[in-house]
Curated annotation (Swiss-Prot):
Localization of this protein: Nucleus
One Pfam family recorded for the sequence: Beta-prop_RSE1_1st
Gene name for this UniProt entry: CFT1
This protein's name: Protein CFT1
Disordered: annotated segments: 156-188
Record's compositionally biased regions (Acidic residues): 156-167
Subcellular location, principal: nucleus
Organism annotation: Debaryomyces hansenii (strain ATCC 36239 / CBS 767 / BCRC 21394 / JCM 1990 / NBRC 0083 / IGC 2968)
Biological process per Gene Ontology, one example term: termination of RNA polymerase II transcription
Function as written in the Swiss-Prot or TrEMBL entry: RNA-binding component of the cleavage and polyadenylation factor (CPF) complex, which plays a key role in polyadenylation-dependent pre-mRNA 3'-end formation and cooperates with cleavage factors including the CFIA complex and NAB4/CFIB. Involved in poly(A) site recognition. May be involved in coupling transcription termination and mRNA 3'-end formation.
UniProt GO molecular function: RNA binding
Record family assignment: Belongs to the CFT1 family.
Xref: InterPro entries: Beta-prop_RSE1/DDB1/CPSF1_1st, Cleavage/polyA-sp_fac_asu_C, RSE1/DDB1/CFT1/CPSF1, WD40/YVTN_repeat-like_dom_sf
Transmembrane regions listed in the UniProt entry: none
Length: 1342
């Protein structure tokens, strides 16, 4: 019984598109990252030079793998685009933006898997989604099966009236009796958007069509027109002498009513490597046919123009007669990215290695005379690095976003160096030169075409403005220590020996290391120790104020005088301090104690006393205070609140009356802020009056959308002073400075609903039961953008965050759901609140507007422009107080106090990225990394890297083979290096160069037994073992070697303290067959060489083989646990073996009978039961068990299959680590597995007990069936739908999906109570929360 949790989200951008999704006047960027859908807007920063940044509007975790995203313009809204999101399993969701919920809304879901699967014997794999430029239809293609979805379009008269607007976009969605329609929150009929979909075979359109390679809709046709490239005779490089030019190109005009087609043109005998069609919009026409060695342009009249771009073109086609020769460019076009530049006669082409090229067209009127390829000068994109670029999205203001598979994803501006006046003129006419990428222009607008042609002579400079981080692809990772200093600034290191994940990322020049730390790594500059304090504040960067709540003492320390005490006769020293505040730009200070309030000048001389005012509250104590600008809000233990306006110029204060309706209400806490929350209702109170009277407001359609986006919140005036109060019955109340007795509340905030709307406050006759402890209503963000958020801290330690947004009429708040679980209600997690939790707001911490949370596990709440708010663990030590800190050495830092009364002055490191669930630091290596390991004794990292070199084809004797044509460019081979990296400054301090064609396949740090065979006891030594593969020509099998190195201490070079270690060779040995896997077992090491597995013993005088095993194929994975061994191969899943040292032997214990291509595997151990987690090449996890006592296991010879689970990404590496038991520690050590994927995500699979599994399984079923899921996707179908029936039969206790289960914590209170009743009639609410805490904290011991 196990559960799956993805704790690091994918970062690799697989799909992107620019469209008018939210606003009709500006394009949004829609990004797909495996299962995450993100919506960005473009913002400009206020700098010397205008800079564009991507700002995340919202992100959505989908229960399915995103395979494509397209935009479509529907009849429901002529100004905004809808999105077609296709997902794995031939599913297509039509979604739109709901401005009233600040979220996506699912219009319809179209499910074609069963229809496609019943029409073919082939297994359904990937599908392609294409959209007709005029929004007439879409097509989801699986090989030769074409599924069309016709869309309703405006009639021709309306099209003529709205020529520019109606034609800019794409179309999309289907309603059919067999198709599901989920998630239409408006409850309106959507059948008017589209007609019934239909599926046809490509051969039905034209009998000449063979196997379809690619299909696209073409521009500049009034009727839907498709271009298809197909082949009837199969060809590949090996049979080119027999079969050449087997590709055909056909253009068909479709009739969606009769489902018939008319042939427009057909071209035969194209080269075999043509595999992609690029349709060209105006001012160009036709399409580009992309091959590996050539480009062919076919215009709308069927005229072809051909370019030969390397010397291999002559080998793949029968004649070069019609080709224009540009073979001197020597281009390799495999998987290149191609994008027409809007309103230009250039097409941008980016190769796999990141080189930029133009495909230039010479146009005479409307006729293309010729085209050629031109390299873009390196100076025009010198700071832009791309490796295997993917899709390209065009945006407003000449911006382009490029998805990058093996590196970060840049946002570029295309800046025209010349003819800038022409660009301006175009902007005046067409709003943006990049705005109408999918627009059908009038074919007869010659003047406009001529204007665009004038741009073609100008050069373009590509300027990088921003980029999205990409942690992938990850192929290998290790666990190590980022911070190893036991003490920092004479105090214990709060991150001492915290286990971090170190992985590879990227490739080629964008290759590097990722360092993922489970908590923030503050840079500690200095420290202080106190005898007894509980809270502290910094004032004006000059004074540190401390409070001792037990001994009722307060003290002042001077920061610039080595923290010397400052004595002040006016300062209240004999009481504990509740709050310290700064007034008038730190010219005055305000001290609040339980009984007194004083205002001091900069010399701590009292100028204002509140003693007379506070006499009426003599029997009460002040428990909390908050201050903003001139306003002080004071909360008393009796539940009363008082607001004062302090005038330091007149040395006076004025009491601010709160709305009378609150006079008899118990107030527990509050906040003063500058906010837009009440701007709309302050201008028009009817917004709430009409709502209370039951006036129904239309939530969809043209009018609502236009209203909501044409009334920006900026038009409602600047932010105003807003007072926020929390009542004893957990309502949040808001009113302005001049409230005129108007008091508003956030409706249903006590139930923590998904959306909070404003309403009039009405007193309730309820018994106070406060569970809201603290609130902060303020901005979160970085230096580029900030948004208003309501942050709520509950008594149980839960942290809830709501984002303020404008829905077109009023301001609302929407709950952020992608947050970790920090606490629980009903005292379910009492350990989390053993030290009081408080929210502390920081307006600037190294550029971030953030919130710190005190407690036994302190937290840091932060938000970047590219992310939603994140909650990070702040070090391993508890924290009882936080305060801002700045001096000559530290700017915008902080000082915090732990529970041992030690204070640390530190900074938040800016070289970490805070966009994901853990802080991530990237270390550039600028080479592809194959393997990484951590050497604990020397605290260094060893990596295996490789680079591309020209391939030298040699035979077994090392001589060049006969028949090699040296006049043509050679293929690529690889050369490997083993590098030693010091974490001191993350530089390479030693390198082992391997021979040409040799790569370090595996690098591992092992603790091996070393000594003579005659000795009974051997020494243990940590060594580096390297397994390599030596790759030769295709007719010769690969060989390899294993090498053993010790990392020794040396005297560092002068001025380079990091160079204090180097490699020392212990042993190396060549092997027959590549070494594909290595691992340590019982003090020896295992080497998998070819189809043989040998365990060797390291002795003083060499290496001795002690046990061996033969396999049928090569081993892809080898892991050990004690004396148990996993062996995984590429065909027959895994084998479980045991190793015995007396006598030396390997015993086969059991094997898995599935036919799996094993990528990686490792052990999961609980209660002395042995489970093995297998990750195959089909993005599926399999859990098997070794249980000799089970009668179905044939005495253990058969590993029992327990569960299978789809993870939507290719798994690459798995490591076993101990599991943290937060609530109920186990008597024996429990082991879980951490895994990585190619998309940059990390997951863990961990064992749980029977009772928790039963509760969580029922809860998961209820949430799956009853709750709303984005894009209408089914979580159960996502995890188990693609598995075979045989596997599903054995899924009696499937893996739990924590992604679904954790939705429980984000539901409103009523839904949570209702679901808990479905789990059990007994009171299991607290048990469910304990399970959630247990699941969320399995990695806490790192």
């Amino acid at each position: 019984m196990d559960a799956y949790h993805e704790f690091i989200q994918p970062t690799r951008v697989s799909q992107c598109i620019g469209c008018n999704f939210i606003s009709p006047t500006s394009k949004s960027l829609i990004v797909g990252k495996a299962t995450v859908l993100q919506v960005f807007e473009i913002i400009t920063t206020e700098t010397k030079t205008q800079q564009y940044k991507l700002k995340l509007v919202e992100q959505f975790k989908l229960h399915g793998l995103i395979t494509d995203i397209k935009a479509i313009r529907t009849v429901e809204n002529s100004q905004l685009d809808y999105l077609l999101v296709s997902s794995k399993g031939a599913k297509m969701s039509l979604i739109k933006w709901d401005h009233h919920l600040n979220s996506i809304s699912t219009v319809s879901l179209h499910y074609y898997e069963n229809s496609i699967q019943s029409s073919t014997y082939e297994k359904l794999t990937t599908t392609d989604l294409v959209v007709e430029p005029n929004n007439n239809c879409t097509c989801l293609r699986f090989k030769n099966l074409l599924t069309f979805l016709p869309f309703e379009t405006l009639d021709e008269e309306e099209e003529d009236d709205d020529d520019d607007e109606e034609m800019n976009g794409s179309s999309g969605s289907d309603k059919k009796a067999t198709n599901k329609e989920n998630g239409n929150s408006n409850g309106e009929e959507v059948s008017e958007l589209f007609e019934s979909s239909f599926m046809i075979d490509g051969r039905t359109l034209d009998s000449r069509i063979g196997d379809i390679i690619d299909m696209q809709f073409l521009y500049n046709y009034r009727e839907p027109t498709i271009a298809i490239i197909f082949s009837k005779a199969h060809a590949w490089a090996g049979n080119l002498p027999k079969v050449k030019d087997n590709i055909n190109f056909i253009v068909l005009s479709l009739d969606l009513v009769t489902k018939a087609s008319t042939t427009v043109l057909k071209i035969d005998n194209l080269p075999f490597d043509i595999d992609k069609i690029i349709p060209l919009p105006q001012p160009l026409n036709g399409s580009l046919l992309m091959g590996c060695n050539e480009i062919i342009h076919v215009d709308n009249g069927g005229i072809t123009r051909r370019l030969a771009l390397n010397q291999f073109t002559s080998s793949i086609t029968t004649s070069l007669k019609n080709y224009h020769d540009q073979s001197d460019l020597n281009l390799k076009l495999e998987n290149c990215s191609v994008k027409p530049i809007p309103n230009d006669n250039k097409v941008l082409m980016i190769l796999n290695n990141g080189d930029f090229y133009y495909i230039n067209f010479k146009i005479d009127g409307k006729t293309i005379k010729k085209f050629f390829v031109e390299k873009v000068s390196d100076l025009n994109y010198d700071d832009i690095q791309l490796t295997y670029p993917g899709e390209i999205a065009t945006l407003d203001n000449n911006l382009m976003f490029i998805s990058n598979k093996n590196g970060n994803n840049p946002l570029l501006e295309l800046k025209y160096k010349n003819f800038e006046h022409v660009i301006v003129q175009e902007n005046e006419e067409n709003s943006n030169p990049l705005d109408n990428e999918d627009e059908e222009d009038d074919l007869y607008e010659e003047d406009e075409v001529n204007k665009k042609i004038s741009i073609n002579k100008s050069s373009i400079e590509f300027i990088k403005h921003d980029e999205l981080l990409n942690n992938g692809p990850i192929s290998n990772f290790t666990l190590g220590h980022y911070s190893t200093d036991k003490f920092k600034s004479s105090l214990p290191n709060p991150n001492y020996k915290e286990v971090s994940i170190i992985s590879n990322s990227g490739s080629h020049k964008q290759g590097g290391l990722n360092i993922l730390t489970p908590s923030v790594q503050p840079i500690i500059q200095s420290s202080l120790s106190f005898s007894q304090i509980h809270r502290m504040w910094t004032i004006n960067n000059e004074f540190l104020i401390t409070s001792d709540d037990e001994n009722f003492k307060s003290e002042i320390f001077q920061l610039n005088k080595s923290f010397a005490r400052l004595n002040s006769k006016d300062f209240i020293n004999n009481e504990s301090t509740i709050g310290m505040h700064e007034l008038n730009n730190s010219e005055f200070f305000l001290q609040v104690t339980p009984k007194k309030i004083f205002v001091f000048n900069k010399k701590f001389k009292k100028i204002i006393s509140f003693n007379k005012e506070l006499k009426k509250y003599a029997n009460d104590e002040i428990i909390y205070s908050t201050f903003n600008d001139e306003f002080l809000m004071v909360f008393f233990s009796s539940g009363e609140v008082v607001i004062y306006s302090i005038n330091t110029y007149n040395e006076s204060f004025t009491k601010i009356n709160i709305p009378k309706i609150l006079n008899d209400t118990i107030i527990t806490t509050g906040y003063i802020t500058n906010s837009s929350l009440l701007n709309a209702v302050s201008k028009d109170i009817n917004l709430l009056i009409n709502k209370n009277r039951g006036t129904k407001r239309k939530h969809s359609g043209k009018n609502t959308s236009i209203t909501s986006i044409n009334t920006p919140d900026s038009d409602l005036g600047p932010k105003s002073k807003t007072f926020i109060l929390v009542t004893g019955d957990n309502r949040i109340v808001a009113f302005n400075r001049f409230h005129n007795e108007r008091c508003y509340q956030l409706n249903d905030v006590d139930k923590f609903t998904d959306h909070l709307s404003l309403g009039f406050f009405e007193p309730r006759d309820t018994y106070p039961d406060p569970f809201i402890k603290n609130i902060i209503f303020n901005e979160l963000g970085d230096e580029y953008s900030k948004d208003e958020y309501l942050t709520i801290l509950t008594i149980g330690g839960e942290i809830l965050v709501y984002k303020l947004f404008f829905d077109g009429e009023n301001f609302k708040l929407v709950k952020e759901k992608d947050l970790i679980i920090t606490g629980a209600p009903d005292n379910a997690y009492s350990l989390g609140t053993t030290i009081e939790r408080r929210l502390v707001y920081f307006p600037n911490v190294n550029g971030f507007t953030s919130i710190f949370v005190t407690g036994i596990t302190p937290y840091y709440i932060s938000k970047t422009t590219h992310s939603v708010p994140r909650i990070f663990k702040f070090t391993k030590l508890p924290a009882v107080s936080f305060a801002p800190y700045s001096d000559d050495k530290i700017k915008n830092g902080l000082i915090y106090l732990d529970n041992s009364k030690n204070a640390r002055i530190c900074e938040i490191p800016v070289d970490f990225n805070y966009e994901n669930n853990w802080p991530i630091k990237k270390i550039p290596i600028k080479e592809s990394i194959k393997s990484v390991t951590y050497h604990e004794l020397s605290n260094t990292f060893v990596i295996s890297t490789y680079e591309e070199i020209p391939y030298d084809c040699l035979d077994e004797e090392g001589k060049p083979i006969v028949g090699v044509d040296k006049s043509k460019p050679s293929a690529n081979s690889y050369k490997g290096y083993i590098k030693l990296i010091s974490p001191y400054n993350w530089s390479v301090i030693d390198t082992i160069e391997l021979v040409d064609g040799e790569i370090g396949m595996n690098v591992q740090s092992m603790v091996l037994d070393v000594g003579s065979s005659t000795k009974k006891f051997k020494n243990k030594k940590e060594l580096i073992v390297i397994g390599t593969g030596k790759y030769r020509m295709e007719d010769l099998s690969a060989n390899g070697s294993f090498k053993i190195f010790e990392i020794i201490d040396i005297i560092p070079e002068p001025g380079k303290p990091e160079t204090n270690h180097k490699f020392k060779e212990i042993h190396q040995e060549d092997t027959k067959g590549a070494v594909t896997s290595i691992c340590e077992i019982s003090g020896r090491f295992l080497v998998s060489q070819g189809q043989k597995i040998i365990i060797r013993d390291l002795q003083d005088d060499g290496v001795v083989p002690v046990a061996f095993l033969d396999t049928s194929v090569y081993v892809s994975e080898a892991k050990s646990f004690g004396n148990l061994l996993i062996l995984g191969d590429s065909l027959k899943s895994i084998w479980l073996a045991g190793f015995d040292a007396e006598p030396f032997r390997m015993v086969m214990l059991g094997k898995d009978l599935q036919s799996l291509d094993v990528n990686c595997a490792d052990f999961i151990i609980k209660d002395e039961e042995i489970f093995i987690l297998i990750a195959d090449n089909n993005s599926t996890l399999h859990l098997v068990k070794y249980d000799p006592e089970d009668p179905t296991s044939s005495n253990g010879q058969r590993l029992i299959h327990k569960a299978s689970f789809n993870i939507n990404s290719t798994p690459t590496c798995i490591r076993s680590i101990p599991k943290n038991e937060e609530i109920n520690p186990s008597s024996t050590e429990v082991f879980q597995s951490i895994g990585s994927t190619i998309d940059g995500s990390f997951y863990t699979v961990f064992p749980i007990n029977e009772a928790s599994y039963r509760r969580m399984y029922i809860l998961q079923q209820q949430i799956t069936d009853k709750e709303y899921h984005f894009c209408g996707l089914n979580p159960r179908l996502n995890r188990f739908g693609g598995l075979s029936m045989t596997v599903n039969d054995t899924n009696t206790k499937p893996l739990l999906d924590y992604e679904v289960i954790r939705m429980f914590a984000k539901l409103n209170e009523d839904r949570r109570k209702n679901l808990s009743m479905k789990v059990s009639s007994k009171n299991v609410y607290q048990d469910i929360w304990k399970d959630l805490i247990e699941f969320d904290h399995v990695l806490k011991n790192l």
